[in-house]
Every structure is written in C-alpha cells, then in structure tokens.
C-alpha cells in the first residue's frame, strides 16, 4: 500500500486518571477513517510516545491495525535515541502489524550526517519494516540534510520522508532528489498545500486529528492543482494552523479534542493548555462540525 495524501499523526487519548483511553482511541480512529484520511501515524511525537509503556504501545498499535483493517496504511513511530533501541522498537512495531516505521532523527544525541546515514541504513536493513525518515530539527536538535537524504533514498527499504521544516527551499531540494517509490511529505500544516503544489506527495498532519475531512479536502485540492480554491480553503483553516503553534505539540490539539469529547489531557512533563488560550480553543471547537460537514461533501477520490 503506497503512501500519499493526508496522513494524521494521531494523539494518544488519556482518561481523567491519565490512563490510556481505549474507547476514545477507537472513536478517534473511526473519526479519521470516516473523514477520509489516507494513513495514520501511531505513537509519534504527537502521540506522546515518550510517555507510553511498552504495553500501551502494543495495545494502541494492535487495536489500530485491527480497526483500520487494511483500509489505509498504519505507520508506527519507532525512532529512539539509540540505533539498537530503534531497531528493536521497529521490530516490535512489525510484530504488532504496522505497515511502516516513521523514524525520527535520534533526539538529543545530535549525530553528524555520517552518523545519521549509518543509523537509518541499520534500521532499514534490520528493523523489518519500510522506513519513512522524519526530520524535525526544532525537536531533535539535529537536521537531516537533503544530501544525506539523497544517499538514503536509494535504499529499497527507505520509502519516504516527513520533512517538518517549513522552508520551501528545503522541500524543493528533497523533491529534486526523490526517486520513484520515495515519497516526500510535509510535516507542517500551514505550508503543506504550497509544498504539494510544488510536487510533494502529501501531509502528515496534526490538525487533522480534529478536522480529518477538512485536511483531506486541502490535500485533494493541492493534488488537483486548484490554486485559487486552495487559497480560500487555507484561509478557513488558518486559525487552526496558528492555534496548533500556540504551545508545544500536542497541547493545543488535545485541548480541541477534549472539547469535542475525545480524551482528557496529557502526561507530564506536558501541562494542559494555558487558561489564557481557552477562549480561542472554545471558538475553534465550535467551528469543527461545520467545517467537517462542508468538507466531507467535497472529498474526491484520489
């Protein structure tokens, strides 16, 4: 199953006591599928993977694979600070039924480009899953440069990249080096339409947790080259783009989800959305149903 279009980086819903909320998880998955998403990421940074136990990781992934039932690709976040641990986590994801591993650059370690290349080649060769590279320097402290991606993209088990840098030049550099079978995804909601108009294959989105149909529509417009319609639709979503940047991800998006009845909070060291932002959260939550209803009538088959 190939990767393209809108993929949601799912949150992990917790209950009032901070435990994994399986019922809310299933409802979130169902909402994504009904909204037309073309893939889901389990236990990535948006999913607070660093706070999950092994048992929770297994339960989330297994239940998602069963619920999705092969309708869309399931990507598992498996990137950890060490290469051996990342390989082990990737094997764990494979055992739980994931179709792909989304592997972030090793956080905190700050390897050089040679180290990053060796790391990803080891995971691709030993992890047991097709690998999607994930570059998010603002979180990890290291930057996977396009020339390193060019070297890695030739490996048959490295099938794409999620690039969270919003720089147009960065995305264009990645597009210039890609080969058939290697997908380039934006990891930035606000600039994704522009990236897709330039040739990117899709978006791995945070805001689509609450607006799956709306972001599917955005991606459909971009893939169809509808520049005028994209500008209008992006304007409708601009407040959501801005809101998701008010605090560390996934604090804002989980505040919106809580307001529509999915989950109750985060795990330390993350704290709930500041009270000073509650009014805007309430305002945006009130818009969700109308935006989803409007965009669900506009989804086209890709």
Curated annotation (Swiss-Prot):
Residues reported in the UniProt entry to bind pyruvate: 46, 204
Main localization, broad class: cytoplasm
GO biological process annotation, one example: diaminopimelate biosynthetic process
EC numbers on record: 4.3.3.7
Function recorded in the entry: Catalyzes the condensation of (S)-aspartate-beta-semialdehyde [(S)-ASA] and pyruvate to 4-hydroxy-tetrahydrodipicolinate (HTPA).
InterPro entries in the cross-refs: Aldolase_TIM (IPR013785), DapA (IPR005263), DapA-like (IPR002220), Schiff_base-form_aldolases_AS (IPR020625), Schiff_base-form_aldolases_CS (IPR020624)
Record bears the keyword Translocase: no
Protein localization: Cytoplasm
Active site (catalytic residues): 134, 162
Gene3D superfamilies registered for this protein in UniProt: Aldolase class I (3.20.20.70)
Keyword terms of this UniProt record: Amino-acid biosynthesis, Cytoplasm, Diaminopimelate biosynthesis, Lyase, Lysine biosynthesis, Schiff base
Superkingdom of origin organism: Bacteria
First-tier enzyme category under EC: lyase
Catalytic activity: L-aspartate 4-semialdehyde + pyruvate = (2S,4S)-4-hydroxy-2,3,4,5-tetrahydrodipicolinate + H2O + H(+)
Single annotated GO MF: 4-hydroxy-tetrahydrodipicolinate synthase activity
Residues the record marks as site: Part of a proton relay during catalysis: 45, 108
Disulfide bonds listed in the record: none
Name of the gene this protein is made from: dapA
UniProt cross-references to CDD domains, sorted A to Z: DHDPS
Oligomeric form and interacting partners: Homotetramer; dimer of dimers.
GO cellular component, one term: cytosol
UniProt record similarity statement: Belongs to the DapA family.
Identification of the protein by name: 4-hydroxy-tetrahydrodipicolinate synthase
Coiled coil: none
